[in-house]
Design a protein with these regions (language model features):
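Catalytic beta-strand/loop cores that center a nucleophilic Ser/Cys/Thr
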Residues: 777-778, 795-894, 912-931
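Extracytoplasmic/secreted cell-surface and envelope-processing proteins
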Residues: 382-383, 403-405, 443-445, 771, ...
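Short beta->alpha connector loops at strand-helix junctions that form conserved
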Residues: 153, 165, 375-376, 396-399, ...
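Short, solvent-exposed loop/turn segments at secondary-structure junctions
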Residues: 28, 137, 181, 472-473, ...
C-alpha cells in the first residue's frame, strides 16, 4: 500500500487543533429492568454500580443468569431443546446449556443507564461541542445535568450529539440511557446486527467515546469522488457556520505541488461546497493488487474564529457494470467472497481496533478471498481502514433481515441507516457494494427495494448497489445475488449434483446466469459442515462459552466414540474441503458470473450450530485445511480442468479440457504444463499446452489432455496437476482394472440376506458377505438415516432433517480389506458410488465390541455409532456386513466392483479373522423384509 498526499487548506492566521476529552474508563451504572428510569429521573442522581467503558453489560458481568426462561433475541428455529428428553438435563438451572448457539453467562435485553461526571475546560467557551459514541448498541438517549439532549438509534455508524448549548465550562453530569430491545423498529431478530445467533444483542458502548470541541465555523463532512475517466477529483464539503452572520474564507487547494486559491462567503448555518481538482496523468489506482491510498487534509479557518482540520483517506477506483460483467478501473473483476456474520466469541461485539481487522482480513486473503459480505450488519471504521490498506472489497448491509415495504417503522429506519453508513464510511475505497440486508420479506418488497436502490444510485455513485442478498432479482440492481448458481440449496437434499450425479468437474451454472443481463454473484454457496473440534472449547475465555460443544461431546462420550473425535473432525473436514473446492471451481467455470459469497470461510456459531468453515469462529485453522491448499482453487489465477468423469477403468481413455480463470494481469505466452502422478509422486504422464495470451476473465480454454490408461494394471489413485506460470491446481482421479461382474462375484458367497444358503455356509465355518440392498436397512438400525456423498448442509436441526445426515467416511487406509481399493482415511470421489448406494448401519444395538472397517461419521447432534462395513463371527462362520448395495446395476459401477473385489480378496485371506460374535437373530434384525 502506498499513500499519496493531497492537501486542501482554508487560509488562517492561527492553527489550533480540535480538542477532545476521552470518556473511556469507569462509569456509574444501573440496570433499568422495569423501564422506570425516566419517570424516576435517574439522570438527576448518581447511579449505584460501576462498569468499564468501552464495554458491554456482558463484559462487565452485568445481567441475569441464563436459563430456560431467557428471552433471546433470535428465532428459535428448532425448539427441540425445550421439549426433547435428551436435553432435559441441560434445562436444569444448575447445568443449563443451550445447543443452538454460543452461550453467555449473563444476558440482558432492556434499558441500562451509564453515567459520569466531566469537566469542560475554560478554553472550550464559545466552541461547538460534540459527543461521539462509536458502536452504541442500540438506542441511546442523552441527558446533561438533567436536560435531555436527544435520541439516536443507528446500529452501524457512530452516534453523535451536538451538546454545545448544554456544556459550558465547568462540571457536568452525563447520563446515557441505552436500550437494546427490539421494539417498534424491527430489523429482524435474526439480523446479525442484533441477533444472539452471532454477536449477540449486547447493551453498551464499545468503541471510541469522547467529547470534541471545534470552532464555531467547522468542517462537518468531506466526500471525495474520484472521476477517473476525467482525471478529476470532485469534493463535496459541508461546512457549518454557527455564527449568526456570514463569514469570509479563502480556500487553497494544494495537489501535487500546485495551488489554486478561491474565496467563499459562508452563510450562517450549513454550507454545501463543491470543488473539482485535476488529478495527475499517472493515477495510482486502488484495487486488490495495488491498494494505493491518498490522504486529503482539509484545514479551515474563519476570521477571528479559529481553525478546524479534517483528514480523509480515499482511493482512486471506479466500478462499472457492462456486458453482464463487473469492472474495476476498466478491467474485469471477480468477487471471491466470504460472509462475515459478526461472531465475536470473546467480547460479543465487533472490535474497533484496526490491528484485529488486519489479522482477520489477511487470513481471508491468504485463503484467496478478495471480498467480504457483511451479512445484515455493517462493520466499524477500523474494518474499513484495514480493508483500504489491504485492497479488500466490502459489501455492506443496513443491519437488517426484515420484511420491508409494509409501511412499518423499519422502512424509514433503513433509509436513515443507509444514510448514516454512507456518511460515516463513504470515502473508503473498500466500501464497494451496498444492499438493504438479507433475504427480505414483505408483500411489497420488490417495489420498496426498487425505490431504495434507485434512490441510492442517484445519491452516491461511488459503489455498486443491489436490492438484497438472496432475492429479489430487480432490474434496478447493478448486480444480482441469488442462491441458484451453487451446488446445494435449501431443500435439495440428495438431488443436488454432488449427491445425485457421478463425480465430474465439467458442470457450471451458465444455464442460469445467461438468462440475466446483470452480473451474478452466487449467494451463500457452500454451507458444507465438518464435525466439531472439541479442543476449540478451551479458546472460549471471554463472555461466550461453547456449551453446545459440551452437549455434543457428552453424547459422543456416552456412545463410546470419544476416542474418534479428532479423527471425525479431520475426516469430515477433508470432505468439507472437497465440497468447497467443487463449489468454487464450478463458479470459476461459469460464464457471466461475477463472483461468489461463501458461507463460509469460518464457522457460524448459531442457528443450531453451523460448522461450515475451514476455519473456526476465531478465524483459526482446525487442522485439515491450510491457506496454501485452499488458495490453489480459490484465487485470482486458477487453472481448471473439465473432466466428465473421475473414475475410470483401464480400458478407457482419460480426458480433460483445460481452461483458466485469470483475474490478475494479461499473460502473454504463458507457460502451461500438466502432469499426472501416482500416489507416491511418480510422474506417469506430462505435457505442455500453449496459448498466445490469457486475457483477464474466465472460461479461457487452453487445450485438452488425453491418454490411454491400459498400462495401469492395478487399482490406483492418480493426480492431475496443471500449472500456469507456476500457479498450480490439481485433481484426484481413479483407475481400476476392468473387471466383469461375474469375475468379481466368484468365490465368497454374496447375499442380501441370511437365507438358507448363507446360513449353511456359516454353520460349516464358511465365509459370507452380507450386502444390504439399498432401502432394506431397518429403521431401528439406521434405515432412517439419509446418507449421501456430500457433507451435511448447514445443519440438520435448522433444515428440519435435510439430507444428507452424515459427514462422510472414516477408515484406516492400511486395513487389508481396502488394499485393492486405494483410499485415504476420508471420503473422496471414489467413495461416491458406495455412499450413493448404501445405508449407514447403526450398530450400537448389535454389540459393544464392533470395530467398523469403514465408519460413517454421524451428525454431531446424535453421534450414533455408524458403520458402512464391519465384520463379525456368526457361530463357526465369518460374516462381513456391508451397508453398501453390491447387487444393483453393478455393470455400470466400476468403483463398486473394485471395492467388492477388495473386500472379497480380504475375506479370502488369513487376515479375515473377526472376533466379535453375533447371533443370526440379531443380524436378521438389520433387514426390514426378512422372509
Amino acid at each position: 500500500m502506498k499513500h499519496f498526499f493531497l492537501a486542501l487548506f482554508l487560509l488562517c492566521n492561527v492553527m489550533v487543533q480540535a480538542q477532545q476529552i476521552d470518556l473511556s474508563g469507569i462509569w456509574h451504572f444501573a440496570i433499568d429492568r422495569n423501564n422506570v428510569g425516566i419517570a424516576e429521573k435517574w439522570y438527576e442522581r448518581l447511579l449505584p454500580e460501576e462498569v468499564s467503558l468501552p464495554g458491554s453489560t456482558m463484559t462487565n458481568g452485568k445481567g441475569d443468569p441464563v436459563n430456560v426462561d431467557t428471552k433471546w433475541t433470535a428465532s428459535m428455529i428448532d425448539s427441540t431443546f425445550y421439549t426433547a428428553d435428551r436435553y432435559a438435563r441441560y434445562r436444569h438451572p444448575d447445568n443449563f446449556k443451550v445447543s443452538f448457539f454460543l452461550q453467555p453467562d449473563k444476558y440482558y435485553a432492556g434499558v441500562a443507564w451509564y453515567q459520569r461526571e466531566v469537566t469542560i475546560p475554560a478554553e472550550w467557551k464559545d466552541k461547538v461541542i460534540n459527543l461521539f459514541l462509536e458502536r452504541c448498541h442500540w438506542e441511546s438517549r442523552i441527558w446533561i445535568d438533567g436536560r435531555e439532549a436527544g435520541m439516536q438509534n443507528t446500529l452501524s455508524a457512530p452516534q453523535e450529539y451536538d451538546l454545545t448549548e448544554l456544556l459550558a465550562p465547568g462540571k457536568h453530569l452525563i447520563s446515557i440511557r441505552v436500550d437494546n430491545r427490539v421494539r417498534e423498529i424491527n430489523p429482524g431478530v435474526d439480523a446479525h446486527s442484533v441477533t444472539d445467533h452471532t454477536q449477540g444483542n449486547w447493551n453498551g458502548i464499545v468503541g471510541s467515546m469522547y467529547l470534541e470541541a471545534k470552532p464555531e465555523v467547522c468542517i462537518e463532512r468531506v466526500d471525495v469522488y474520484p472521476l477517473l475517466s476525467k482525471k478529476e477529483l470532485k469534493l463535496k464539503l459541508n461546512v457549518a457556520n454557527h455564527e449568526e452572520q456570514s463569514i469570509q474564507t479563502d480556500l487553497v487547494f494544494r495537489l501535487e505541488g500546485s495551488e489554486t486559491v478561491h474565496s467563499y462567503t459562508l452563510q450562517s448555518g450549513n454550507n454545501g461546497l463543491e470543488v473539482t481538482l485535476p488529478l495527475s496523468e499517472k493515477i495510482a489506482y486502488w484495487d486488490e493488487f495495488h491498494p494505493n491510498l491518498y490522504d486529503l487534509t482539509v484545514t479551515l479557518q474563519a476570521q477571528n474564529v479559529g481553525t478546524d482540520t479534517k483528514t480523509v483517506t480515499f482511493g482512486c477506483r471506479e466500478w462499472e457494470v457492462k456486458d453482464g460483467a463487473i469492472y474495476l478501473n476498466g478491467r474485469p473483476a471477480f468477487m471471491r467472497g466470504t460472509l462475515h456474520c459478526a461472531a465475536f466469541p470473546l467480547t460479543g461485539y465487533p472490535s474497533t481496533n484496526k490491528e484485529e481487522w488486519l489479522r482477520e482480513l489477511r487470513i481471508c486473503q491468504s485463503y484467496g478471498i478478495n471480498h467480504i459480505r457483511f451479512h445484515s450488519w455493517c462493520p466499524p471504521e477500523a474494518a474499513f481502514q484495514a480493508a483500504d490498506e489491504l485492497g479488500m472489497y466490502f459489501q455492506v448491509e443496513c443491519s437488517a433481515w426484515a420484511a420491508v415495504g409494509d409501511g412499518l417503522p423499519v422502512d424509514s429506519f433503513l433509509y436513515a441507516e443507509a444514510a448514516a453508513i454512507v456518511k460515516a464510511y463513504g470515502n473508503h475505497p473498500s466500501f464497494c457494494m451496498m444492499a438493504y440486508g438479507n433475504e427480505p420479506g414483505g408483500k411489497k418488497q420488490k417495489e420498496w427495494l426498487s425505490a431504495f436502490v434507485t434512490y441510492w444510485k442517484s445519491q452516491d455513485n461511488r459503489r455498486m448497489y443491489t436490492s438484497s442478498a438472496g432475492w429479489p432479482n430487480l432490474p434496478e440492481s447493478d448486480f444480482l445475488i441469488h442462491a441458484q448458481p451453487r451446488i446445494q440449496g435449501w431443500g435439495a437434499g440428495l438431488t443436488s449434483i454432488i449427491n445425485a450425479e457421478e463425480p465430474s468437474t465439467s458442470y457450471d451454472w451458465s444455464g442460469y446466469t445467461l438468462n440475466f443481463n446483470q452480473p451474478f454473484i452466487s449467494h451463500e454457496i457452500g454451507q458444507w459442515c465438518a464435525y466439531p473440534n472439541y479442543k476449540e472449547m478451551q479458546k472460549y475465555t471471554g463472555v461466550y462459552k461453547a456449551r453446545n460443544f459440551e452437549i455434543f461431546q457428552a453424547t459422543l462420550q456416552e456412545n463410546g466414540l470419544i476416542h474418534l473425535a479428532d479423527s471425525f473432525l479431520l475426516a469430515s473436514g477433508k470432505l468439507q474441503n472437497l465440497c468447497y473446492k467443487a463449489d468454487i471451481e464450478a463458479a470459476l467455470r461459469t460464464p457471466k458470473l461475477g463472483g461468489f459469497q461463501l458461507l463460509g470461510l469460518n464457522d457460524f456459531p448459531g442457528q443450531c450450530t453451523a460448522l461450515v468453515g475451514a476455519l473456526d469462529v476465531f478465524w483459526e485453522e482446525k487442522g485439515y485445511a491450510t491457506a496454501t491448499d485452499y488458495s490453489r482453487f480459490c484465487n485470482s489465477l486458477v487453472p481448471l480442468a473439465r473432466m466428465k468423469k473421475l473414475v475410470y477403468e483401464n480400458n478407457e481413455t482419460f480426458a480433460a479440457d483445460v481452461e483458466v480463470a485469470n483475474y490478475r494481469d494479461e499473460l502473454v505466452h504463458p507457460e502451461i504444463s500438466w502432469r499426472v502422478k501416482d500416489a507416491l509422486g511418480k510422474v506417469l504422464r506430462q505435457g505442455t499446452l500453449t496459448a498466445d495470451k490469457l486475457n483477464i476473465g474466465n472460461c479461457q480454454q487452453v487445450g485438452s489432455i488425453s491418454f490411454d490408461l491400459n498400462d495401469i494394471q492395478q487399482a490406483a489413485r492418480l493426480n492431475l496437476e496443471v500449472s500456469v506460470n507456476g500457479t498450480i491446481n490439481d485433481w484426484n482421479f481413479w483407475v481400476y482394472p476392468s473387471r466383469k461382474v461375474e469375475e468379481v462375484n466368484k468365490g465368497i458367497l454374496l447375499t442380501d440376506r441370511l437365507n438358507r444358503e448363507a446360513l449353511n455356509q456359516l454353520k460349516k465355518g464358511g465365509k459370507v458377505l452380507l450386502s444390504l440392498r439399498k432401502g432394506t436397512l431397518s429403521k431401528e438400525f439406521g434405515g432412517d438415516i439419509a446418507i449421501g456423498f456430500s457433507s451435511i448442509f448447514w445443519n440438520t436441526a435448522m433444515t428440519k432433517g435435510q439430507a444428507p445426515h452424515t459427514l462422510g467416511i472414516l477408515c484406516n487406509p492400511s486395513h487389508p480389506a481396502l488394499s485393492a481399493f486405494p483410499t485415504e482415511y476420508h471420503s473422496d470421489y471414489q467413495w461416491w458410488d458406495a455412499m450413493s448406494h448404501s445405508g449407514a448401519i447403526s450398530y450400537a444395538g448389535l454389540s459393544e465390541n464392533i470395530h467398523p472397517i469403514v465408519h460413517v461419521i454421524d451428525d454431531w447432534f446424535t453421534n450414533r455409532p455408524l458403520a458402512l462395513v464391519f465384520e463379525v463371527k456368526v457361530g463357526k462362520g465369518k460374516l462381513l456386513v456391508s451397508g453398501i448395495d453390491f447387487h444393483q446395476d453393478m455393470e455400470s459401477r466400476p468403483a463398486a466392483r473394485q471395492l467388492l473385489y477388495s473386500l472379497k480378496q480380504y475375506m479370502k485371506s488369513d487376515a479375515f479373522r473377526p472376533d466379535t460374535e453375533i447371533s443370526v437373530e440379531i443380524i436378521n434384525q438389520l433387514i426390514t423384509d426378512q422372509i
